[in-house]
């Protein structure tokens, strides 16, 4: 055969050839290749001949390495091939008929699935366990009943198979049987053995009762309930996978860990979801199991769930849990805001409703009005600040004109201004309030007794006469500096008793009553 460099060198020449020439050239190269291969094979055969004898001698002495399989694999492989002779040889050489693979499957299980009646008979004669359980507690009768092999079911029942055997799903052979004839055979056999519904329920409860006894014995011995068992699973994993509600409740009562993980990172909720145990899913979630817990493969309980009913239940529980978390988060944030603003007056006031705020203001003004209703002190009050004077000047009503025919009704001694103006004011406008002083009721002047009966014209004339007799004051007068006998002596002594900027007292707008009545003292403020 041509070398690589030779082939590369002739490529330009081959590219210029016609189709027929290229075909002939390829056939020539192929003939050379076959010739070279035949020569190499001949040389290889000549070299192998002398070495065969030592290899056979080494094999006879057991010095060469060989592939050997365990007896369980060999027996199951022969039974699966329905090789009666080979199985008989294995059983005759001392191989146990109950050998199982990694899933707990025995040769008898496999033959019941494959419907090998003669092989089943041979294994039973060799002493095979007729009630052998695999990893999911399936017996050979479970396998035969599920597959509907009537003659195998009859053979197993005749050999003493357990009709009440329960697998990990809580199913008995008759629960898994869909064939009518096979089901009739099972029910007839159960009736012949006197099996009732009570005995069936008692048989279903046996695994859980056994686990409950085991848990109680561990509790009495003070053993750790969180200790991992096979494959790193805890007792709660086992109870969740098998649907043992009472056992799981007992474990949770003694604070079994809901977040314990097995070797695959599965929590008990993963196991309950994978094996479709709806009551256990609800129980674990109610005790705080994490619906978003992830395994080593980043799988949540919802990811490993294969049953639609369980999946729907998980989604429902997840939605409820998320809604509850959102509600709790809003409540915590509200409490946090209230706690942080407890020392801030502004935030507290903003949280008060309008009705509550109005009631608060009304209560404050009512208390202030009660204070102002008290009799004024006999001693002169000190002059108020400029703020009080400014406030009184701003709140003082304009003086009435004589040409104005409108007469203002006396309202609790207040003159002028809108009756609603000072309803919610912080400071009482004393410059527009005039009231007869009870302290001056004993004065000999008849003006005090007859004042309520003067007409408006008489009152104006008296005010004008008083203005001519008294020089204009520079500021507010005290009760001691006021001249006796003047109408101004009858007013309540207050720092800013209504004098305007020019010193003129305001004119009262009063109307004479139709019937004489004693003077009544009324509060100076209108209480709403």
Swiss-Prot record:
Residues 40-58 have a biased composition (Basic and acidic residues). It is found in: Cell membrane. SMART domains: ANK. The modification Phosphoserine is found at residue 433. The keyword ATP-binding does not apply. Gene3D superfamilies: Ankyrin repeat-containing domain (1.25.40.20). Residues 18-45 form a coiled coil. Residues 526-528 form a propeptide. It is a lipid-anchor. Residues 19-59, 330-351, 367-421, 462-505 are annotated as: Disordered. GO terms for cellular component: cytoplasm; plasma membrane. Keywords: ANK repeat, Cell membrane, Coiled coil, Lipoprotein, Membrane, Methylation, Palmitate, Phosphoprotein, Prenylation, Repeat. ANK repeats lie at residues 70-99, 103-132, 136-165, 231-260, 264-293. Pfam families: Ank_2. The modification Cysteine methyl ester is found at residue 525. The keyword Phosphoprotein applies. InterPro entries: Ankyrin_rpt (IPR002110), Ankyrin_rpt-contain_sf (IPR036770), Pase-1_reg_su_16AB (IPR017417), PP1_Regulatory_Subunit (IPR051226). Signal peptide: none annotated. A lipid is attached at residue 525 (S-farnesyl cysteine). One of its GO terms (molecular function) is enzyme inhibitor activity. A lipid is attached at residue 524 (S-palmitoyl cysteine). Inhibits protein phosphatase 1 activity toward phosphorylase, myosin light chain and myosin substrates. Binds PP1. This is Protein phosphatase 1 regulatory subunit 16A. It comes from Homo sapiens (Human).
